[in-house]
Amino acid sequence: MSKLRFRVVESAFEKKATEIATMAERPSKYYGELVFNREKMFKYLPEKAYERLVDSIDNGSPLDRETANAVASGMKKWAMEKGATHYTHWFHPLTEGTAEKHDAFIEHDGKGGVLEEFEGKLLIQQEPDASSFPNGGIRNTFEARGYSAWDPSSPAFIVGDTLCIPTIFIAYTGESLDYKAPLLKALEAVNKAAVDVCHYFNPDVKKVYAYLGWEQEYFLVDEGLYAARPDLLMTGRTLMGHESSKNQQLEDHYFGAIPTRVMEFMKDLEVEALRLGIPVKTRHNEVAPNQFELAPIFEECNLANDHNLLIMALMRKISRKHGFRVLLHEKPFKGVNGSGKHNNWSLGTDTGILLMGPGKTPEDNLRFVTFVVNVLKAVYTHNALLKASISSATNAHRLGANEAPPAIISSFLGTQLSKVLEHLENSDTEDFNLAGKQGMKLDIARIPELLIDNTDRNRTSPFAFTGNRFEFRAVGSSANCAAAMLVLNAAVADQLRQFKAEVDAKIATGKDKFAAIIEVIRKDIKECKAIHFDGNGYSEEWKAEAARRGLDCETSVPLIFDAYLKDSSVRMFESTGVMTRKELEARNEVKWEMYTKKIQIEARVLGDLTMNHIIPMATKYQSSLIDNVYKMRELFPADKAAHLSSKNMEIIEDIANRTIFIKEKVDEMVNARKIANKIESEREKAIAYHDQIVPMMEAIRYHIDKLELVVDDQIWTLPKYRELLFIR
């Protein structure tokens, strides 16, 4: 096995970049060529069917069977012209990935042959086995029926030879078994609530869109090195490994020159993404060695989420073509930054106004403050629930580790906005002349005046206002954005409804509309003041202060999930029509079960590696030292031999003590798992794994990492951090 390590290291050094030919056309020419977008709809659909489909997409109007058949026929024709032979309903089960089953475009022709067929009923609905996906007990094997149903708002696309049709996934009894269905409901809820509030300022607003711009961080590791690390292969992260002498302390990787092999991967990925209509815009080195980031232009939230899931699948596929494996785990390497997926979220109207962007008139700025304060109130009211939405066994390694936002939800606003809210809270005057941008003269030749945002950036804040949007930074790199987005949009929708009810009640008593709005805003600012924090979220002082403010400070992931079932959460979800108590209970069962299984797999892999690699390596090196000590005694007088071999004796004893501890702790961990596995309650089982198994794994790792420092490098079988992080 040690020979394998050195072979893959040598092979990785010798690999050349797989050059990607530059596309002859500009990106705008091939953008969306594999997407059944409105341009394709107009070309391939009858006029009446096109108009009805567009109306369904824009306004949610139902589609009749005749229109569905026409759409299916046009979609099939376009897809087959592009080389597609199969179709699939593409959905997002509660596994955090995607699912698909491919069927060919063929049916019997009644004459012993086949013909290509795709009817509206196949487009609209299919019946996957719901019991085979995480469902929290909603579906059993003996009652397995589930339905996938077409989502017309997200266009179909082609991957390889398959037409992929975005769908929701529900149980036979109607409960959602995916992320897309509740996300769509949350987006509709925030649309209705925001439109109602917008009418205070502009009665022409008919629709409000939630926008999402995600920033996908990831690591790339040479596939040979990846294959030689069973922990990476099985869990997505290194369960052991001492920090490299050099990691990110020189701060020389962030925004540095992109390595050649990596650049060719990025170019290949971008071309495929653009062909699939994903508007990728930014690529750069991240803070940690071999860590990178990809970000698109923001899009409507549902479509943006589909595109993020699609881009993660593309990254896994294309990285292998370039001899890499992409790591989307939140913390694949100890001691260097983990990976997140910042979710830039905003609301905008069909009249072209970003609701969280300052305006030019006092009325515009009152609208701006109205929506910002309502978002803050929603985040304050449901801060525990928002934390639950981004919590997982994998993200727990990253949050609060002085590299990512802490596991306490707070909001950074910046100096200017903070002063505006403070002024509004404490004074009777209403001056809303707030600048959107302010100039900065740098006094450097040939550098023009910069327009700077009216907020600074606070990297320690999990939910920061950044000029015209909020940046939810606590989302993990492997997560489905919908988990966080459905909670955020539903919470904001619920708060906007409450706000409107309070304002309307004051107007009904004869109070002026704007005076009523300001009065309710002032009250809400005072009530949600605890969520506002512009300081250092990494500090111990903030943890104590957050507890004093009544913010949720729980750090145990299984207990964090309890927030979904709080009375306030259930009321919010049910009143907005996003999810029922039964659906929430089922999802929590899935969350606890997934947490347990991920820790369970890691513990089993760690135990196997310990017994099959670590202890044999350590004892082999120990034996060579013992042999050396015996030879010293044969060669030198006793006193001199004892002196010359004293350091080796210390190492021999150190190895013995550590291997004994590791073996005993692994045995203890195995027994603890057996006991935990017998617990029937998924919640209690997850708590047992968190409280008992995780600390044992950390203790085992500590001693393994110490052994790595003393065991002969030629004997060590597993690629080390310096190889995993610095070979590109």
Where are these predicted regions, by residue range?
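C-terminal amphipathic alpha-helical interaction region
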Residues: 521-728
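Active-site core of metal-dependent hydrolases
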Residues: 30-143
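Glycine-rich, acidic/polar active-site loops that bind/position phosphate-bearing ligands
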Residues: 143-328, 337-340, 347-589
